[in-house]
Structures are given as structure tokens and as C-alpha cells.
Amino acid sequence: MQEFTKLTGVAAPMPLVNIDTDMIIPKQFLKTIQRSGLGKNLFDEMRYNPDGSEIPEFVLNQPAYRDAQIIVAGDNFGCGSSREHAPWALLDFGIRCVISTSFADIFYNNCFKNGILPIVMPPEVVEVLMEDARRGANARMTVDLEAQTVTTSDGQSFPFQVDSFRRHCLMNGLDDIGLTLEKAASIDGFERDLATLRPWV
């Protein structure tokens, strides 16, 4: 998993509330177990017309936001079904951070496991960040996980809180497999001791 320490990138404003996982990645794209390739179908029904042409009004189709790495979202982002394809699609598009007033619990947890930082902020702060994001390509926010701050393009800085264990995992690029491998020596030692103490097992 890619490390997350400090990110400076374009922030896309998505004020719509209750963006669910089916909106993030529709069900017809869930047949794959590959994490790559889903970015082209991120927000598919919001990005494309039935004939496959782009909907120009959708934020990620606008030139200023095509390379966005941050989303400033409306309340209750990631609600709906528990599909892990949702963070996969966001990450494959290039999104590394989502800021909202609240997230669905399962989506929130899945983000951390896939290298995305979900940040919960008070409504008044999210509104400031949303307005900054509306400045287009000039809205290059900085998300500093070590300092736990979000800084707008005009220098306003806002603190955020994140669980220390999740922060450690993101900053060191540790998913579940990586965490297990960190303990490989201890696991090997336990297995050797177990074989000596309980050879019949």
C-alpha cells in the first residue's frame, strides 16, 4: 500500500449529500477482483451519458478537476452497501483523501485499508474548504497527516483528528498484509516454540 504522509493537490468540490457506494462505483462493475482499472468507472452514472459521452457539468469532467487528488464532499459520504470496490475506484482514479462532515462506518474503515485518508471535519470547516475547492485548479490544498492539518490554497489551516493506529498504518503504507509481515519474526518464533513445547500439534 502506498504511504500517505503529506499531499498537495487539486481538491474537487462535491457538495451532494448521501453519495452512496453505488454512485461511487455502480454494481455492474463489481465483477472484477482486480483493484486496478476501476477509476474509469468512478461515479460512472454521474460522469457519463448513456451513449458513453461525458457529462460536461460533472465536476471530475471539468478541466480544472480532472487530476483531482482530494474530494471535499457533502455529508454521509460512502453510505450504502459495503463494497470495497468503492475505495478501489477512488484510488485508481487518483483520489487519496476525502473530506466530509461524516462517513459511513464500513466505507471509512475500507479507506484506511486501501491507502485513502478520510477526514471528518465540522460543517463550518467543510464549507470553507468547499469554497476553496470551487476555485478550480488554483485550489491546491495540502493535507499533512503527520501534523494532522488541512491547509487551503490561501493559507488557512485547520486541524483534524485521526486514530493513532490508523495514522501509523497510512504513514507507513501498511495494509493488513503489511501489518502481518511486520510481525513475521514473532510469528516464526511462536511457531518454533510451539513445535518444541507441543510437538503433537
UniProtKB/Swiss-Prot annotation:
Q: Name one GO molecular function term.
A: 3-isopropylmalate dehydratase activity
List, alphabetically, the GO terms of the cellular component aspect: 3-isopropylmalate dehydratase complex
GO terms under biological process = L-leucine biosynthetic process
Keyword line: Amino-acid biosynthesis, Branched-chain amino acid biosynthesis, Leucine biosynthesis, Lyase
State which pathway it belongs to: Amino-acid biosynthesis; L-leucine biosynthesis; L-leucine from 3-methyl-2-oxobutanoate: step 2/4
Q: Which cysteines bridge via disulfide bonds?
A: none
What is an example of a Pfam family matching this protein? Aconitase_C
Enzyme Commission number(s) = 4.2.1.33
Q: Which InterPro entries match?
A: 3-IsopropMal_deHydase_ssu (IPR004431), Aconitase/3IPM_dehydase_swvl (IPR015928), AconitaseA/IPMdHydase_ssu_swvl (IPR000573), IPMI_Swivel (IPR033940), LeuD (IPR050075)
| Reactions the enzyme catalyzes | (2R,3S)-3-isopropylmalate = (2S)-2-isopropylmalate
| Purpose of the protein | Catalyzes the isomerization between 2-isopropylmalate and 3-isopropylmalate, via the formation of 2-isopropylmaleate.
Family membership noted in the UniProt record: Belongs to the LeuD family. LeuD type 1 subfamily.
Concerning PANTHER family, the annotation shows: 3-ISOPROPYLMALATE DEHYDRATASE SMALL SUBUNIT, 3-ISOPROPYLMALATE DEHYDRATASE SMALL SUBUNIT 2-RELATED-RELATED
Complex formation: Heterodimer of LeuC and LeuD.
Name-wise, this protein is: 3-isopropylmalate dehydratase small subunit
